[in-house]
C-alpha cells in the first residue's frame, strides 16, 4: 500500500503563475493548500497519486496566480462612481467630492460603499486592498464580515470632518482603531495623512514620531499635480517630497501615492530612502494629473506597486485593468516598447504590492508557507484563443471579468463567480438607495 499525504485542497489547473520565481509558469500542475497556507505546487499526476485531499477542484483551461493587491483606494467612494467626471483634480475635489462627503460621509456610507467595493474587487481578483477613508471602524467591521484582507490607513487632515475635528483627534481615533485590530489576522491599521497640502508641519512631525515608535506605515498622496509642486515651493521653499524627507517621513515604511510630477532628484531621493511608489495610472489619466515614470523608477531600484484609487475617479476597481494600463502607459512614457513587460506589470499588482505593505513574506506569490490568497482565471473564452502565452493574455486583454474563483487565507470567497460571504442582492439594493439619496441633492 502506498502512503499518501492528507491535504485540504488540491486546485488542479492548466497553468500556475507563481510570480516568484520571476517568469516561471507551471503547466498541468496542482496548487496544494493546507489550512490557510500554500503547501506546494506539484504535477497534477503527482497530486492524484500521492495526496488525499479534502476537496479537489478541477480547473481545466484555467490559470492560478496570487490574489491581486490593490495598494491605494477609497472604498466608500465607490458610491460616488460617475458622480463627477471630466474635470481636473482640484475642481473635482473642492466643488464636487468634498461637499457631498461633508453631507453624507458616515458609518452607513462607509459600510455600504465598502461592501460594494469589496464585491467588485473580489469578483475581479483582488484579495487584499489598501484604503484611506474616514470611519475606518465601519469599514474594518465590513472587511471582517467579508473575510477579505485589508490595510486601513486612517486619514489625517487639518480641517474638521464628520469623523474628527482636528489632527489630534484623527490621530487619537486612528490609534484606537489600530489597537482594536492589533491581532487581527486579515486587517492592519496605519497612518494616512491625506496630502502635504492638507496637513501642516506640526501634525506631520507628530506622525513621523509615532510611525517611528510604532514601526507603522505612512500612506500619503504625493506629487499628484503640477499645482501641488508649485504651491509647495512657494509656501515652503521646497518640493513636497523633500519636505517629507526633512521631517523624517520618507522611509521604507512610506507609500508615495501617485508621484506623477517627478524629477531626477526626486527619483534619487526615493531610491535612497527605500520609500515605495503607488502608481494609479487610470485615475491619473482620467484627471490628467500627469505621468508616473515607472520605468525610470524601477531602473533606480524603487519599488512600484499599483492602486486603482477610488471608483469616484477611476471609475473601476478592476486591478487587471490597472496593471494593463500600467504596462501600456509605462511603455508610452518611457518611449520603449520593452519597458514594463507583462511579467513586470503582474509583479506590480502582486509581489511589489506585498513589499509595499510589509507582507512580502506572507503574500504576493504562490510559494510554500505563504498565505493561500489565490485566484483562478478562466482562459477558455474564444477571444483569448489561441493561448500562446497565458501571461500575455493576462495583461493585454480584458481579464477581470474572467476570474472564476477566489481564496483568501484558504477560505473560498468567490465560487464559480458567486460571492460566498457577501450578498449581491443586498449590496445592489443599498447602492440603488444611495443613488437616490445622492442624486436628489445634485
Curated annotation (Swiss-Prot):
Molecular function (Gene Ontology), one example: S-adenosylhomocysteine deaminase activity
Keywords: Hydrolase, Metal-binding, Zinc
Cofactor, free-text remark: Binds 1 zinc ion per subunit.
Catalytic activity annotation: S-adenosyl-L-homocysteine + H2O + H(+) = S-inosyl-L-homocysteine + NH4(+); S-methyl-5'-thioadenosine + H2O + H(+) = S-methyl-5'-thioinosine + NH4(+)
Binding-site list for Zn(2+): 72, 74, 221, 309
Enzyme class label: hydrolase
Cofactor: Zn(2+)
EC number: 3.5.4.28, 3.5.4.31
Keyword RNA-binding appears in the UniProt entry: no
Binding site for substrate: 101, 194, 224, 309
Family matches, as HAMAP family: MTA_SAH_deamin (MF_01281)
Family listed: Belongs to the metallo-dependent hydrolases superfamily. MTA/SAH deaminase family.
Primary role: Catalyzes the deamination of 5-methylthioadenosine and S-adenosyl-L-homocysteine into 5-methylthioinosine and S-inosyl-L-homocysteine, respectively. Is also able to deaminate adenosine.
NCBIfam families: PRK09045.1
Protein's name in the database: 5-methylthioadenosine/S-adenosylhomocysteine deaminase
Amino acid at each position: 500500500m502506498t502512503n499518501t499525504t492528507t491535504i485540504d485542497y488540491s486546485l488542479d489547473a492548466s497553468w500556475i503563475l507563481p510570480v516568484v520565481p520571476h517568469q516561471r509558469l507551471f503547466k498541468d500542475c496542482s496548487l496544494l493548500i493546507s489550512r490557510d497556507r500554500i503547501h506546494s505546487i506539484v504535477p497534477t499526476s503527482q497530486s492524484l497519486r500521492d495526496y488525499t485531499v479534502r476537496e479537489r477542484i478541477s480547473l481545466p483551461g484555467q490559470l492560478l496566480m496570487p490574489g491581486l493587491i490593490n495598494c491605494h483606494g477609497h472604498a466608500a467612494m465607490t458610491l460616488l462612481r460617475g458622480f463627477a467626471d471630466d474635470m481636473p483634480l482640484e475642481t473635482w475635489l473642492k466643488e464636487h467630492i468634498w461637499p457631498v462627503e461633508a453631507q453624507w460621509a458616515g458609518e452607513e456610507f462607509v459600510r455600504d460603499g465598502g461592501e460594494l467595493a469589496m464585491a467588485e474587487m473580489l469578483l475581479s481578483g483582488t484579495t487584499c486592498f489598501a484604503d484611506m477613508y474616514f470611519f475606518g471602524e465601519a469599514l474594518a467591521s465590513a472587511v471582517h464580515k467579508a473575510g477579505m484582507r485589508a490595510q486601513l490607513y486612517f486619514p489625517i487632515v487639518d480641517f474638521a470632518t464628520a469623523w474628527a475635528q482636528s489632527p489630534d483627534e484623527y490621530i487619537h481615533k486612528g490609534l484606537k482603531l489600530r489597537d482594536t485590530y492589533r491581532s487581527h489576522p486579515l486587517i492592519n491599521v496605519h497612518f494616512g495623512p491625506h496630502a502635504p497640502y492638507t496637513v501642516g508641519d506640526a501634525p506631520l512631525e507628530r506622525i513621523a514620531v509615532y510611525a517611528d515608535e510604532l514601526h507603522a506605515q505612512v500612506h500619503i498622496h504625493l506629487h499628484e499635480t503640477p499645482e501641488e509642486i508649485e504651491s509647495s515651493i512657494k509656501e515652503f521653499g521646497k518640493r513636497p517630497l523633500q519636505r517629507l524627507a526633512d521631517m523624517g517621513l520618507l522611509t521604507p515604511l512610506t507609500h508615495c501615492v501617485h508621484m506623477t510630477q517627478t524629477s531626477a532628484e526626486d527619483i534619487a531621493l526615493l531610491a535612497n530612502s527605500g520609500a515605495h511608489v503607488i502608481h494609479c495610472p487610470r485615475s491619473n489619466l482620467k484627471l490628467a494629473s500627469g505621468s508616473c515614470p515607472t520605468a525610470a523608477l524601477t531602473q533606480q531600484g524603487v519599488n512600484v506597486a499599483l492602486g486603482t484609487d477610488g471608483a469616484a475617479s477611476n471609475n473601476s476597481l478592476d486591478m487587471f485593468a490597472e496593471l494593463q494600463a500600467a504596462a501600456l502607459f509605462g511603455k508610452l512614457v518611457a518611449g520603449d516598447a520593452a519597458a514594463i513587460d507583462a511579467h513586470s506589470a503582474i509583479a506590480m499588482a502582486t509581489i511589489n504590492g506585498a513589499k509595499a505593505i510589509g507582507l512580502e513574506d506572507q503574500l504576493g506569490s504562490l510559494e510554500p508557507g505563504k498565505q493561500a490568497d489565490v485566484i483562478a482565471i478562466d482562459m477558455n473564452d474564444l477571444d483569448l484563443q489561441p493561448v500562446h502565452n497565458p501571461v500575455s493574455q493576462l495583461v493585454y486583454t480584458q481579464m477581470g471579468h474572467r476570474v472564476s474563483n477566489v481564496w483568501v487565507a484558504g477560505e473560498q470567497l468567490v465560487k464559480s463567480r458567486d460571492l460566498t460571504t457577501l450578498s449581491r442582492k443586498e449590496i445592489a439594493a443599498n447602492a440603488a438607495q444611495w443613488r437616490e439619496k445622492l442624486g436628489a441633492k445634485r
